[in-house]
């Protein structure tokens, strides 16, 4: 897979689990992901699009087929453009009629016609007319539908003039989902929705949704945003984002309001059952449930829709804050307990360790909290135990840990072992001047792999007044620093040189092209578009060696992407460079 020319820019700004906070830019308009698109029906505007914009929704989705089918709407859209038609200056994405195709079995438009129509009315993100196969359909039907979808994808690719969705289909057949994802990833599209999951969500088959999303994600390029079509209930946001979903859409805010239903992050309640509002949004702060019940239907519907939107927006922000703090798994764990089927889906997700581990940061801002038995299966915990076992082979002296069992004594300062909380306390063993170097060597083995400890065998370790190791030097030159926050090593350029000599290519390498080489030497950050190759075992926030195509060391820094992501992303930073070989002190 190579970097393709894209009409849309997407880069990762922050991350946790397989979730990411991203910046998506199209037609000069920017949004931050994860983001939710309220569904706007141009025939039934419960909440005006400009009001949605004021509430902070900078992207909406509407249905181009509904506009196309209505003669008056079609003529207005062609004359004014969709932004003036809806009186909305944010990003407008459109569906193509696929949902109607799934619900009613047919649509009166061709794939080419709807793609060309979307361009003519000036949408920001279009969608070609894929075939959504419902769950549990006969395999023969799923295969035939997917064949047509892929044919239409090729047609759309050849004529599209706007950024476009390419929806992953395949019913509940995971191999077909993965196949569709791989085929669509090879084409020039910008966003990949995962389609035909609404029936599963409506019937609380969340475990099947997890299987479908992961199968799709495993086949998709990581540099393209993923949209979970029809997922608009806040109870699933944390779980979906942890899987790697970036975009959601919600018609539920309006549909539930029509039925006097009230959204919460834990589920849906009927207005007639409520005595109190636990929410503090503008609607719930002003009215009581009784007052809403006594209102005329139309007024009540609008206010309930507004409440539902505030709850949706609040939960998206809560998910993003959890990512910033390295707490997304804790939020997923909490939300999963709202419903047994959601809890089962959470447990299923944790079975996909090898997928999740690639994107799991190597260190986090927050301590590891053992809040449940499931937390021991979080990727950060499983990886730590696996790495500790390898270190134990070389440093067999061990101590008991209340969460992780027997761990190497010399890793007792290191994340997540020292930075963890459970029912029982863990007492770290501070180094002595005699054994401090063993701590450094063990940390290097844990962090950089087998044999890395030898790079520091002859080093001197400075112990701070707190009794903790800090600077690692040789003949006055800094090799590394033990970070106070997580007990891991930040490399100095001399330490990077030693590791570079010791570790075989391509271990911990990020290879940059000739254009970026002089900037890396001077300590400038490395952007993804200049990365030629990266060790696929690099994980987010690893300390890495930046080299040129001849494997000459240029700099050292902290990876912001996984190794595979660095090679595929064309926007954003790949490595935060700490020190270049030619950088002046």
UniProtKB/Swiss-Prot annotation:
<dbReference type="GO" id="GO:0005737">
    <property type="term" value="C:cytoplasm"/>
</dbReference>
<feature type="binding site">
    <location>
        <position position="279"/>
    </location>
    <ligand>
        <name>Zn(2+)</name>
    </ligand>
</feature>
<keyword id="KW-0862">Zinc</keyword>
<comment type="similarity">
    <text>Belongs to the archaeosine tRNA-ribosyltransferase family.</text>
</comment>
<dbReference type="InterPro" id="IPR036511">
    <property type="entry name" value="TGT-like_sf"/>
</dbReference>
<dbReference type="Pfam" id="PF14810">
    <property type="entry name" value="TGT_C2"/>
</dbReference>
<dbReference type="GO" id="GO:0016763">
    <property type="term" value="F:pentosyltransferase activity"/>
</dbReference>
<dbReference type="InterPro" id="IPR015947">
    <property type="entry name" value="PUA-like_sf"/>
</dbReference>
<protein>
    <recommendedName>
        <fullName>tRNA-guanine(15) transglycosylase</fullName>
        <ecNumber>2.4.2.48</ecNumber>
    </recommendedName>
</protein>
<keyword id="KW-0808">Transferase</keyword>
<keyword id="KW-0328">Glycosyltransferase</keyword>
<dbReference type="InterPro" id="IPR002616">
    <property type="entry name" value="tRNA_ribo_trans-like"/>
</dbReference>
<dbReference type="InterPro" id="IPR004521">
    <property type="entry name" value="Uncharacterised_CHP00451"/>
</dbReference>
<keyword id="KW-0479">Metal-binding</keyword>
<dbReference type="InterPro" id="IPR050076">
    <property type="entry name" value="ArchSynthase1/Queuine_TRR"/>
</dbReference>
<feature type="binding site">
    <location>
        <position position="284"/>
    </location>
    <ligand>
        <name>Zn(2+)</name>
    </ligand>
</feature>
<dbReference type="GO" id="GO:0008270">
    <property type="term" value="F:zinc ion binding"/>
</dbReference>
<comment type="pathway">
    <text>tRNA modification; archaeosine-tRNA biosynthesis.</text>
</comment>
<keyword id="KW-0819">tRNA processing</keyword>
<feature type="binding site">
    <location>
        <position position="281"/>
    </location>
    <ligand>
        <name>Zn(2+)</name>
    </ligand>
</feature>
<dbReference type="InterPro" id="IPR036974">
    <property type="entry name" value="PUA_sf"/>
</dbReference>
<dbReference type="InterPro" id="IPR032729">
    <property type="entry name" value="TGT_C1"/>
</dbReference>
<dbReference type="InterPro" id="IPR029402">
    <property type="entry name" value="TGT_C2"/>
</dbReference>
<feature type="active site" description="Nucleophile">
    <location>
        <position position="95"/>
    </location>
</feature>
<dbReference type="InterPro" id="IPR002478">
    <property type="entry name" value="PUA"/>
</dbReference>
<dbReference type="InterPro" id="IPR038250">
    <property type="entry name" value="TGT_C2_sf"/>
</dbReference>
<feature type="domain" description="PUA">
    <location>
        <begin position="507"/>
        <end position="582"/>
    </location>
</feature>
<dbReference type="GO" id="GO:0003723">
    <property type="term" value="F:RNA binding"/>
</dbReference>
<dbReference type="InterPro" id="IPR004804">
    <property type="entry name" value="TgtA"/>
</dbReference>
<feature type="binding site">
    <location>
        <position position="130"/>
    </location>
    <ligand>
        <name>substrate</name>
    </ligand>
</feature>
<dbReference type="Pfam" id="PF01472">
    <property type="entry name" value="PUA"/>
</dbReference>
<dbReference type="Pfam" id="PF14809">
    <property type="entry name" value="TGT_C1"/>
</dbReference>
<comment type="function">
    <text>Exchanges the guanine residue with 7-cyano-7-deazaguanine (preQ0) at position 15 in the dihydrouridine loop (D-loop) of archaeal tRNAs.</text>
</comment>
<dbReference type="GO" id="GO:0002099">
    <property type="term" value="P:tRNA wobble guanine modification"/>
</dbReference>
<feature type="binding site">
    <location>
        <position position="196"/>
    </location>
    <ligand>
        <name>substrate</name>
    </ligand>
</feature>
<dbReference type="Pfam" id="PF01702">
    <property type="entry name" value="TGT"/>
</dbReference>
<dbReference type="InterPro" id="IPR038370">
    <property type="entry name" value="ArcTGT_C1_sf"/>
</dbReference>
């Amino acid at each position: 897979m190579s970097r393709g020319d894209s009409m849309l820019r997407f880069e990762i700004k922050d991350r946790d689990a397989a979730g990411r906070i991203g910046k998506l830019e199209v037609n000069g308009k920017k949004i931050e992901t994860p983001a939710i698109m309220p569904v706007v029906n141009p025939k039934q505007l419960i909440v005006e699009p400009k009001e949605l914009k004021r509430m902070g929704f900078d992207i909406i989705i509407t249905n181009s087929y509904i506009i196309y089918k209505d003669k008056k709407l079609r003529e207005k859209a062609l004359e004014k453009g969709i932004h003036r038609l809806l009186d909305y200056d944010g990003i407008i994405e459109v569906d193509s009629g696929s949902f109607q195709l799934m619900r009613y079995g047919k649509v009166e438009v061709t794939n080419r016609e709807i793609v060309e129509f979307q361009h003519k009315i000036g949408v920001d993100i279009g969608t070609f007319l894929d075939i959504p196969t419902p769950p549990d359909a006969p395999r023969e039907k799923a295969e035939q539908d997917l064949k047509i979808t892929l044919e239409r994808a090729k047609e759309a690719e050849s004529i599209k003039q706007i950024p476009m969705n390419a929806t992953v289909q395949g019913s509940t057949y995971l191999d077909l989902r993965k196949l569709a994802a791989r085929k669509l990833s090879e084409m020039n599209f910008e966003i990949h929705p995962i389609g035909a999951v609404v029936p599963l969500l409506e019937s609380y088959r969340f475990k099947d949704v997890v299987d479908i999303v992961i199968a799709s994600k495993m086949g998709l390029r990581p540099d393209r945003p993923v949209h979970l079509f029809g997922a608009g209930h806040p109870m699933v946001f944390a779980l979906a984002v942890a899987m790697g979903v970036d975009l959601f859409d919600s018609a539920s805010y309006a549909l539930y309001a029509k039925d006097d239903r009230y959204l919460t992050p834990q589920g849906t309640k009927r207005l007639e059952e409520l005595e109190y509002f636990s929410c503090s949004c503008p609607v719930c702060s002003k009215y009581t449930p009784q007052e809403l019940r006594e209102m005329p239907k139309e007024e009540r519907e609008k206010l309930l829709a507004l409440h539902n939107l505030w709850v949706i927006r609040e939960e998206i922000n809560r998910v993003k804050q959890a990512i910033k703090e390295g707490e997304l798994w804790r939020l997923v764990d909490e939300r999963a307990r709202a419903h047994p089927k959601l809890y089962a889906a959470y447990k299923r997700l944790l079975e996909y360790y090898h997928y999740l581990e690639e994107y799991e940061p190597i260190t986090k801002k927050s301590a590891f909290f053992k809040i449940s038995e499931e937390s021991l299966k979080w990727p950060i915990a499983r990886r730590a135990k696996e790495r500790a076992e390898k270190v134990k082979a070389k440093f067999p002296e061990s101590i008991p840990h209340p969460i992780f069992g027997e761990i190497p004594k010399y890793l007792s300062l290191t994340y997540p072992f020292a930075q963890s909380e459970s029912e029982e306390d863990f007492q770290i063993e501070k180094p002595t001047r005699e054994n401090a170097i063993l701590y450094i060597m063990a940390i290097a083995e844990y962090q950089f792999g087998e044999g890395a400890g030898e790079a520091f065998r002859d080093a001197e370790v400075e112990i701070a007044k707190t009794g903790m190791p800090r600077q690692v030097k040789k003949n006055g030159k800094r090799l590394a620093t033990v970070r106070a926050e997580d007990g891991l090593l930040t490399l100095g350029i001399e330490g990077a040189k030693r590791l570079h000599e010791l570790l075989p290519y391509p271990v911990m390498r990020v290879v940059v092209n000739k254009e970026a080489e002089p900037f890396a030497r001077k300590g400038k950050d490395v952007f993804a578009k200049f990365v030629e190759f990266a060790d696929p075992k690099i994980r987010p926030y690893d300390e890495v060696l930046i080299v040129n195509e001849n494997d000459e060391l240029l700099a050292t820094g902290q990876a912001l992407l996984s190794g595979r992501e660095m090679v595929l992303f064309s926007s954003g930073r790949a490595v935060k460079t700490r020190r270049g070989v030619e950088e002046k002190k």
